[in-house]
Each structure stands twice: as C-alpha cells, then as structure tokens.
C-alpha cells in the first residue's frame, strides 16, 4: 500500500520522520501559544515585556544584540512554516537613557530631555534651540540622518486686565496658583487665590478670574481645553491695571516652556522625551547643537536581572520562555518561575 508522507510517496515499508513546528504558532487568537525571549539587546526599554509583531518592528525596537537575533529566528523558523503572530522580548541588560538639561536665559534649569530609547547609542542624539522663524523658538533634534524640527513654538494661554474701582491690581502665577491682588489708598488686598487643582483647564481659570469684579480675562487661541496645572510660565506679582480702551495694558500669561515640552512629547518628534522643571518663568535659552550624554548599555548582566524579567512576565499571557543564557542559576530561576506560574499563577508555562 502506498502513502504520501511529508511530501514523499512511500511504496515500501520504511521508517520516516518529519519536523513538526506547528506547535510554536498562534493557531488562532483564542489559543494562547506565545513565546517570550529574555536576552541582551542594544535597544528597547529594559526589564519590560515588549510585544513585537514582525521582524521589521523587532529590528526597529531592539536595534541589535542576541535578543534581536533570537527574535528574528523565531519569526522565521523555516521557509515552509509561517512565524508566530507575536513574540514577547524582554531586554535583560539594565541600560540607561541619555539626557541633557536645557537652561533658561538666567542659566536656571528649564527642561530635562531624555532619549526615548535606552543605551549608549543614544549619546549621539543632539538638540539645537534657536529663534523661531516668526515667533517663539525653533527646536531641532537629530540622530544620524533623522531630524525633527519644531518651528514657531510659542504659546499665549490667556490675557487679563483690571478695570475696576481699586487704584490698581496685579496678578501672580506659580505652578499651583493664580493670585489676584488689588490696591486702594496704598493698601493691598488679596482678591483671590485660584487653586489650579480646582480649575484644571485654561478656560476654567479664565472663568474664575472673570468672576472677580473688575478683572477681565480672555483665552488666547485654541488653548481653552489645555491643562493649567504646572504648565503656566510663572510670573511674579505684576501690575495688570488698564482702565483705558482698548485695554491692551494688561498681562498675557504664557506657556512658552510647556509648548516645547508638548512638541517634544508628541508624535511629531520620536527621539527624546521632555519634562518641564518646576517653577519655570520662561522657555529655554537658545542653544547651539549639543549632545545628550549618560546613556549606557548597563553593567554586566546578573541573575537578579533575569529574575526581575521573570517577575515582569508573571502578568503577561505567554506560554513559552527562552532565556538566552547558559548559566545554570538562570535556568534554575526559570524552572522555579514555570513551576510557580503553572500552579499558583494559573498560567501554564514551559521553558527551553
């Protein structure tokens, strides 16, 4: 009796075998069979499960190293078998970000920028700040041939003036409050202390100011829905009295620091992240091309680094774990992890 087996027609009794690798595939979305690989790479957030869905994405995220090579091989196990739908990669080497602190015109700390990725390769990211083409600042961020440019970065939040019965009035702004003052016969009174936590948008703040007799505020541009908390350029107590039309002698409250932070953290720029320093009064000063520094690929990997990665995988829906290590202590930790997850953790796992 003849039979077809593994693409061959067998006509005589014989022993035949084939490699069956279908078990490594996600057969359907409802069937969990996902591989997690732990190893060293030159890109990616450390000690964090990274869900990857293609070789191209893996190369973009992991950059290089044994972890990338293993993921590439897992996505393309053979020319005859399609790869899995997803692979979870965990970078075991505790790399650090590169960073730089931007200063304001008074040499005070203004914005802290850090590389979005981790590793020594990010020390070649550089940033430049110059005057905007028509207003504000022009910020350029570059790594290799990739350049992102944000131009005319300036932001007016709201305009306020006083036209009441008092002799004069003033406004002060900090990260958590807007304070209104009035002065009559040389006696100053605090009219209102507006807690930004209670008025979290620019429109909320403007409405609250307008509730005080003699004070008038208007939102500038499309900023009404933006957050007011720790985003306003701080301002010391400043006179905002204007009792003559067209009432242009008041004060404009700005966010020239925050607008740069928002641009850096948006999808318009993908190399660095930014954080505004507390109590800033203005945006950053101009800066010639300057590099970020401090990024490393981390110290030598230890057993605790692997156990940290295994801990992070406890909440992930994976069924197979491959640690790229020949260390017996690492494999002992993986064995303990699989035993725990397959019983107490109620997520059956195997390692190889």
Sequence positions of predicted segments:
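Surface-exposed assembly/interface segments
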Residues: 1-352
């Amino acid at each position: 009796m003849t039979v077809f087996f593994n693409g061959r027609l067998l006509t005589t009794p014989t022993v035949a075998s084939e490699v069956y690798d279908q078990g490594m595939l996600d057969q359907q979305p409802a069937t969990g069979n996902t591989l997690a690989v732990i190893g060293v790479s030159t890109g990616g957030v450390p000690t964090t499960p990274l869900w990857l869905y293609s070789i191209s994405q893996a190369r973009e995220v992991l950059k290089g190293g044994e972890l990338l090579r293993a993921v590439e091989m897992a996505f393309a196990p053979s020319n005859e078998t399609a790869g899995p739908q997803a692979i979870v990669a965990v970078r075991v080497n505790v790399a650090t970000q590169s960073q730089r602190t931007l200063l304001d015109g008074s040499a005070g700390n203004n914005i802290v920028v850090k590389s979005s990725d981790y590793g020594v390769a990010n020390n070649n990211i550089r940033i430049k700040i110059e005057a905007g083409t028509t207003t504000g600042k022009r910020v350029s961020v570059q790594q290799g041939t990739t350049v992102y440019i944000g131009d005319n970065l300036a932001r007016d939040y709201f305009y306020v003036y006083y036209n009441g019965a008092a002799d004069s009035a003033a406004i002060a702004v900090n990260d958590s409050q807007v304070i209104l003052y009035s002065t009559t016969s040389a006696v100053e009174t605090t009219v209102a202390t507006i807690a930004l936590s209670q008025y979290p948008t620019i429109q909320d703040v403007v409405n609250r100011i307008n509730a005080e007799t003699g004070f008038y505020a208007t939102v500038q541009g499309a900023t009404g829905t933006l957050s007011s908390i720790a985003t306003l350029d701080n301002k010391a107590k400043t006179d905002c009295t204007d009792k003559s039309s067209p009432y242009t002698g008041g004060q404009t409250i700005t966010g020239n620091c925050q607008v740069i932070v928002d641009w850096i953290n948006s999808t318009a720029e993908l190399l660095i992240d930014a954080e505004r320093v507390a109590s800033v009064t203005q945006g950053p000063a101009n800066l010639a091309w300057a590099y970020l520094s401090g990024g490393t690929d981390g110290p030598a990997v230890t057993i605790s680094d692997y156990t940290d990665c295994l801990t992070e995988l406890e909440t992930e829906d994976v069924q197979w774990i491959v640690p790229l290590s020949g260390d017996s202590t690492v494999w002992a930790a993986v064995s303990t992890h699989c035993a725990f997850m397959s019983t107490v953790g109620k997520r059956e796992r195997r390692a190889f």
